[in-house]
């Protein structure tokens, strides 16, 4: 196989650098940045790698609604009517086939099948089966592609989340947003190309930790890592000028600092110095762009109502979905939401009902809002967690409650928007929802398909690192799932 390698070499001159640079703040302190001023010419960071996109894209940007903790497919998008008659019977060994279990259930003496407590109904022209827990998402079914045959090798949360976010279970690889920002560049000179928001669910108090490396850039230049938007009066740290410092003075100090950094760059040829220069300049421009982003007074009441009652509370999933739409309007390339709290090992009916209420209306509103603004056609949306849940009960099964363990062999997600066929389902599992029987889609197949929607050949977006040609879709043979493409 021939790969189209693009080295991480420093641009040969200042003009090239300024037209190709992007930015991420990461953990760099920026307490001394200056205010916006007419003196500051905003350098363009719009250009990505030469030759990208490889072909005409269907999508310009991605919104990834990651449901951290792994929502159960049996209570969301995987309708298995036979589970009603199989309820409380033992999961046959012929179905499990000795497959690996977690330490939480491997010692159980019994593996009773647990039916879903919630009803399913068909929706839209495609007759998509969706749980009663998600009535608002169901209204968007004609725009959804529900994938019921996702699978992964990872059985524990952190490696499984890392796998979805970076294409590898090993920590330290570039995240999906970093790869896309690196390859395609930014569409907005005044905001980072990759922004991250985190919300906590109401269904479970404790959630899996989310480490900053999940939106990191790995061996790519640090300008491509994600920037976290916080739910506070200071959404991005260290953008404001120190109290009592006139903007003109801060601008002059920034110019002087740029000159010193430029001298160091010319002497040392360290790409991270170039990144630092652009970090300061973008942060300078963000002093105006971020307050404008966070100003919701221009949102009509009927739009706020679409997202539900939590939309006015900073840090909620609803608020973050509205922010995602505002970022899409501003052409941010990759918008990552994490919603924590889906790890329902016990008391699943109660916990999952609360989690679903957190995300159902805002997720549906985001899709509908993008569509009414003409943005859905070129915005790719992904909704799902890191693996699925077992058909058998973890712990004691009763008529009122049950829990489900981790299940990497098969689970469901949905996609919508740019490049994706709506109103369809893809893949199928057996009667127990345990093994895939049709259309398997690996995590790295998802990555290959996402890149394809953005006009990128996943086999050609690579970097050489420690003897490997790293790519988001991994080093094994993977495929674009053309069956779900519009």
Give the positions of each predicted feature:
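Ligand-binding pockets and gating/stacking loops
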Residues: 1-486
């Amino acid at each position: 196989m021939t790969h189209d390698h693009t080295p991480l070499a420093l641009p040969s001159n200042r003009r090239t650098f300024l037209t190709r640079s992007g930015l991420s703040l990461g953990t760099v302190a920026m307490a001394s940045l200056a205010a916006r001023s007419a003196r500051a010419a905003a350098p363009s960071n719009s250009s990505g790698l030469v030759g990208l996109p490889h072909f005409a894209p269907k999508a310009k940007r991605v919104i990834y609604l990651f449901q951290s903790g792994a929502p159960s497919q049996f209570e969301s998008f995987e309708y298995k009517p036979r589970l009603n008659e199989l309820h409380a019977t033992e999961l046959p060994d012929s179905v499990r086939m000795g497959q690996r279990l977690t330490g939480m259930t491997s010692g159980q003496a019994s593996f009773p099948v647990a039916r879903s407590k919630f009803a399913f109904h068909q929706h839209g022209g495609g007759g998509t089966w969706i749980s009663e827990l998600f009535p608002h998402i169901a209204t968007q079914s004609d725009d959804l592609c529900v994938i019921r045959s996702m699978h992964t090798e990872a059985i524990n949360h952190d490696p499984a989340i890392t796998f979805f976010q970076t294409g590898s279970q090993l920590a330290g690889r570039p995240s999906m947003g970093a790869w896309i920002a690196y390859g395609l560049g930014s569409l907005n000179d005044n905001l980072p190309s990759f922004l991250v928001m985190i919300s906590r669910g109401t269904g479970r108090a404790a959630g899996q930790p989310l480490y900053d490396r999940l939106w990191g850039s790995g061996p790519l230049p640090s300008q491509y890592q994600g920037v976290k938007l916080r739910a506070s009066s200071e959404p991005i740290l260290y953008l404001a000028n120190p109290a009592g410092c006139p903007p003109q003075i801060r601008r002059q100090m920034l110019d002087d600092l740029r000159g010193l950094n430029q001298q160091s760059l010319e002497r040392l040829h360290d790409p991270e110095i170039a990144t630092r220069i652009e970090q300061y300049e973008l942060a300078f421009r963000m002093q105006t762009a971020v307050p404008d982003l966070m100003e919701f007074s221009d949102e009509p009441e009927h739009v706020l109502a679409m997202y539900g009652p939590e939309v006015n509370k900073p840090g909620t999933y609803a608020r973050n979905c509205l922010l995602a739409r505002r970022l899409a309007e501003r052409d941010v390339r990759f918008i990552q939401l994490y919603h924590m709290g889906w790890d329902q090992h016990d008391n699943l009916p109660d916990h999952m009902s609360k989690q679903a209420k957190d995300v159902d209306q805002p997720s549906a509103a985001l899709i509908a809002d993008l569509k009414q603004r003409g943005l859905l056609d070129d915005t790719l949306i992904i909704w799902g967690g890191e693996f699925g849940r077992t058909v058998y009960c973890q712990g004691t099964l009763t008529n009122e409650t049950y829990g489900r363990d981790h299940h990497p062999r098969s689970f469901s997600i949905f996609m919508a928007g740019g490049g994706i066929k709506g109103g369809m389902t893809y893949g199928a599992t057996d009667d127990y929802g345990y093994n895939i029987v049709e259309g398997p889609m690996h995590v790295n197949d998802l990555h290959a398909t996402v890149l394809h929607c953005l006009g990128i050949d996943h086999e050609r977006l690579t970097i050489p690192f420690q003897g490997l040609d790293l790519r988001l879709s991994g080093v094994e043979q993977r495929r674009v799932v053309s069956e779900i493409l519009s």
